[in-house]
Every structure is written in structure tokens, then in C-alpha cells.
């Protein structure tokens, strides 16, 4: 069993006897929960002591395959991005473990697809209930491994759990069709059937929600999954596996294979090219998405891709400045700017430009507080690693060298190497890196424009199109701009747009397919036409 550190000394408690640790085992004729003691407690370390009292059963370090916790031949370290301290050593899965996980998922699929929609719904609901019961501990795991402020981590856990709740309900609403044909002795049926095993590859910035948004839909449809979590944040995926086991999700239905950055490429390729895998779902960079699309093309697998963004945030002269500033803070600085729908380019009309920049700078200084995610009042945690900081630094230096002005921020924060000051730039032009490279950090560059047509042209001058935002009080303009923005999601006078009930996804090179909403489950279903003759 892979090892972790420190938790024994902080008095971690175990889950109560109502939900004892258990594993799952196959049985002839079906898949059932298996009894037996869970492995011993994992131990994590966080310099802020934020994991004291955490449920030890949630702190897993081995892979979860076929309902069993399995070690790997090697381990890799997971670090607290705030302090750089080691949180623990996690199983470093390779190609062999990846193929074993796919086989386990495929064997489980043969039985899981036959489980009634009502029963699948019930199991997903139990999983949701367990997430809610353990929400505080799950949030602290997120903060420990990603650096996200604890308040935001709590928000992510609720968001994550709501996907399980939503798809537990959608599981019972997978309807087909009856089509009356021209021939009197025939009837045509359209069935919806689960596609098979899904390979799920998730990012570090939402280590829980990006799993349940995919896995909830897959399991509701009758598919099984192999999850490869980001190497920076494997603990959240493994904690979800523990709760899935407790909920009674059968062996092999949900599998997790953590791996190091060194093994990530070969493990990703192994699960995406395996002939037993029918579906690939990925959230991450456009560059990596293209590689996975190439893997999928060789065997024509179904894909869902939620890739990079370069979200414009447009402020027209008619906008309410206070509302626009509030929306800008929310859309830019959530998770320290590390979300795919974060505003990356601020386009502000000349007549309101100076007032907006002044108010935005004041709001940033007043409301954004850099610190460790476990500390009360922190709104801006660390970036995930030093490479992310270097990217922000590079964009700031490039912009300044080309004539941009630093209004506030602009440099690394004194707290440590992974912290960067929330930064606002003005006098930004379109030849600067920050206007055509996704930042993924706390940098807000402001471009001044004159006309609506100019703003639309700048906003659409990108090969990606995930989200876009704009503020206006002109009803006619609202309709024009909303329809003309080349993005998959639009926020009108609103900076936070994600919801489990609404479809999430982009256009252009921002991806393929939609997640969440009533449309999300269709990504894991095949249509089958049945012609019934001789009537």
C-alpha cells in the first residue's frame, strides 16, 4: 500500500459504523458489494494543519480497480502547492494497471448495463448522500492538494455532488421513440443503449466536479468508467472511489488509476487506444485534447472534449459599472484564475473605460486576499505549481515590454514561489501574449474599444470558443451580441454561469459535446433503430 504522512498525529477519526469501509467482488450471476476490512488509514500532511480530524477512510493512496484497493510497483509524491510540502505517496500506475482497469470495467459493463434504471438511480443517489455527509472532509482534501481556498472547495463539493443527484434523476428519463412507417405491417423503434466502457481523464483545477460531471452521466446511462485523475490532485478521485464503494456501486463500475506526470502520457494512450474502450471523455488543454482525438480516430471511438478557452469579458458604455466589476471579479479570480471559463480578455468601451478600470482596481485591492487556502479570509490561493506562475509572469513581462501599464499587482507574491499577485493591466493591445494565450492565473488585461462591431471582432478573433461574458443595459444590443459571440456559453450581466442543469461545452477548438444538463447523458448512449415487421 502506498504511504502517506502525518495524519496519525493529528487524531484523524474513522467513518462511523453506519458506513464501514468495504470492497466489492464479482459473483456468478451479478455484481455485489463485498465485505472485508478496508486498508489502514492514509496519512496526509498540510503545513496549515487543515486536515486535522479528517476521516482517515477517505484518504486513499492505492489504485481502485475491480472493487479492490491495489498498490502499484512504484509511487509518486503529491505536494501541497501552498508550501511545497509532501502530502503523501500515491500508487504510480502504468500501462499494465491501466489495461487491468479497462478489463475490470469491461467485465462489469456486461452486468451493469442490465441493472434497471431505477436501481442505477438509487445507487447514484446513495453516492450523492455520502458526498453530502462527508462534504467538509472532501473540501479539505481539495484545498490540501490544489491550494483552492476552503470556501471555494466547499462550493466545488456541493457542485460535484449535485451532478450525482442530477444524473440519478436523469437515469430514469432515458426515453426512446416509436416511429410509424409507411408500411402498415411495420413499426420502427428507436432504443437508447449504453455505449460501453468510458475512459475519463480529468484536470486538477476541479478535481472532484470534473469527475462526477462525467461519471454521473456515464453510470446513469449504464456505462462503466476508468478514471485517470490529474497527477497533482489524485486524492479527490480516490476519496470518491471510497464513497462509491460505500454506496454499493458494483465492482469494476468505477475504477481509478492515479499516475505520475512521467507515466501520464503512456497511461492516457493505453486507456484511449484499448479496443475494449468505447468512449473517451477529457477535460484539459486543447493541445492534449488533439493528441487524444488522434488516439480515438484510429478505432473511431466516441469522444467528449472540454478544452481550452480564451473568454472575452465585454463592458459596453451602457453597462452598470458596479455590476460589471462584481462580475469581473467573479469570472476572473475564482480559483485564482485557474478555470477554463475564466475571463481572459477584458474589452471595455472607451466611454466607460476609465471608470471601470478605476473601480476594478479598487475592488481587487479590497476583496482579493492572497493566502493559504485553509486560512480564514483567503480568496486567492497558490497557483498549482511554479510552471503556472512562470506563465503568468511571462505574459505580464511581455505586455509591459509592449506598452501595457500595470495598474495593480504584477509580480510574485511574498508568500512563496507558487503565489502571484492579482494583476490588472491597461493599455493592452492584441499583439500581447495575454490576449491570445490562455493565462490560467490571476491576470486581467484590459483592451479599450470604440464600437460594438470592433468588440465582436476582437472577441471572435480566437480559434477557441468556450465562454464569453458581456455587460450591457441595451436590450437590442444584448440579443445581437449574445447571438454573434462565437462561444458555447454566454453570460449576460452575469459572471458565474455554470450549473448542473445547463449544458457545458464550447465551439471551435474548445471541444466537442456537452456535459451536465439533460443533454449530458446522451454522450454515453447509442441510438439503435429496430424495424419490427410482419405485424
UniProtKB/Swiss-Prot annotation:
Q: In which pathway does it act?
A: Amino-acid degradation; 4-aminobutanoate degradation
Entry's Pfam families? Aldedh
Q: Which GO terms describe its molecular function?
A: identical protein binding; succinate-semialdehyde dehydrogenase (NAD+) activity
A GO cellular component term found in this entry reads: mitochondrion
User: What is the annotated quaternary arrangement, including any partners?
Assistant: Homotetramer.
Give the residues annotated as active site.
Answer: 306 (proton acceptor), 340 (nucleophile)
Q: What is this protein called?
A: Succinate-semialdehyde dehydrogenase, mitochondrial
**Name of encoding gene:** ALDH5A1
Amino acid at each position: 500500500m502506498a504511504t502517506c504522512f502525518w495524519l496519525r498525529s493529528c487524531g484523524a477519526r474513522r467513518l462511523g459504523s453506519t458506513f464501514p469501509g468495504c470492497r466489492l467482488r464479482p459473483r456468478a450471476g451479478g455484481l455485489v458489494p463485498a465485505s472485508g476490512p478496508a486498508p489502514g488509514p492514509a496519512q496526509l500532511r498540510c503545513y496549515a494543519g487543515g486536515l486535522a480530524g479528517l476521516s482517515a477512510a477517505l484518504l486513499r493512496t492505492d489504485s481502485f480497480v475491480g472493487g479492490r484497493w491495489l498498490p502499484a510497483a512504484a509511487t509518486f509524491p503529491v505536494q501541497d502547492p501552498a508550501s511545497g510540502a509532501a502530502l503523501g505517496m500515491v500508487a504510480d500506475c502504468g500501462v499494465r494497471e491501466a489495461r487491468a482497469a479497462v478489463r475490470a470495467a469491461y467485465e462489469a459493463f456486461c452486468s451493469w448495463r442490465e441493472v434497471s434504471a431505477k436501481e442505477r438511480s438509487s445507487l447514484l443517489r446513495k453516492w450523492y448522500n455520502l458526498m453530502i455527509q462527508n462534504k467538509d472532509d472532501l473540501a479539505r482534501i481539495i484545498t490540501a492538494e490544489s491550494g483552492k481556498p476552503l470556501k471555494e472547495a466547499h462550493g466545488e463539493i456541493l457542485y460535484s455532488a449535485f451532478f450525482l443527484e442530477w444524473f440519478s434523476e436523469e437515469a430514469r428519463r432515458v426515453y426512446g421513440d416509436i416511429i410509424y412507417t409507411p408500411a402498415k405491417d411495420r413499426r420502427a423503434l428507436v432504443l437508447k443503449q449504453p455505449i460501453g466502457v468510458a475512459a475519463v481523464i480529468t484536470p486538477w483545477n476541479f478535481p472532484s466536479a470534473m469527475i462526477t460531471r462525467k461519471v454521473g452521466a456515464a453510470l446513469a446511462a449504464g456505462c462503466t468508467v476508468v478514471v485517470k485523475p490529474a497527477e497533482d490532485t489524485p486524492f479527490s478521485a480516490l476519496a470518491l472511489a471510497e464513497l462509491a464503494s460505500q454506496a454499493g456501486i458494483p465492482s469494476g463500475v468505477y475504477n481509478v488509476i492515479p499516475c505520475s506526470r512521467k507515466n501520464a502520457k503512456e497511461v492516457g494512450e493505453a486507456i484511449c487506444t484499448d479496443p475494449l474502450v468505447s468512449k473517451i471523455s477529457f477535460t484539459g488543454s486543447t493541445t492534449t485534447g488533439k493528441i487524444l482525438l488522434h488516439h480515438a480516430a484510429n478505432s473511431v471511438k466516441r469522444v467528449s472534449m472540454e478544452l481550452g478557452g480564451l473568454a472575452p469579458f465585454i463592458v459596453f458604455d451602457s453597462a452598470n459599472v458596479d455590476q460589471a466589476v462584481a462580475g469581473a471579479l467573479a469570472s476572473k479570480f475564482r480559483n485564482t484564475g485557474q478555470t477554463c471559463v475564466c475571463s481572459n480578455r477584458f474589452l471595455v468601451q472607451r466611454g466607460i473605460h476609465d471608470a471601470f478600470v478605476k473601480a476594478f482596481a479598487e475592488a481587487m485591492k479590497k476583496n482579493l486576499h492572497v493566502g493559504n487556502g485553509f486560512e480564514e479570509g483567503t480568496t486567492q490561493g497558490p497557483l498549482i505549481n511554479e510552471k503556472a506562475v512562470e506563465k503568468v509572469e511571462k505574459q505580464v513581462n511581455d505586455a509591459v515590454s509592449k506598452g501595457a501599464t500595470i495598474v495593480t499587482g504584477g509580480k510574485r507574491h511574498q508568500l512563496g514561489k507558487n503565489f502571484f499577485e492579482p494583476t490588472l493591466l491597461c493599455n493592452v493591445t492584441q499583439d500581447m501574449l495575454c490576449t491570445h494565450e490562455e493565462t490560467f492565473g490571476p491576470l486581467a488585461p484590459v483592451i479599450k474599444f470604440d464600437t460594438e462591431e470592433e468588440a465582436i471582432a476582437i472577441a471572435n478573433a480566437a480559434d477557441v470558443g468556450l465562454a464569453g461574458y458581456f455587460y450591457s443595459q441595451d436590450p437590442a444590443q444584448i440579443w445581437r451580441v449574445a447571438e454573434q459571440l462565437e462561444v458555447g456559453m454566454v453570460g449576460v450581466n452575469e459572471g458565474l454561469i455554470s450549473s448542473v442543469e445547463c449544458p457545458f461545452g464550447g465551439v471551435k477548438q474548445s471541444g466537442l459535446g456537452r456535459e451536465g444538463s439533460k443533454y449530458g447523458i446522451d454522450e454515453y448512449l447509442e441510438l439503435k433503430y429496430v424495424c419490427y415487421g410482419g405485424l
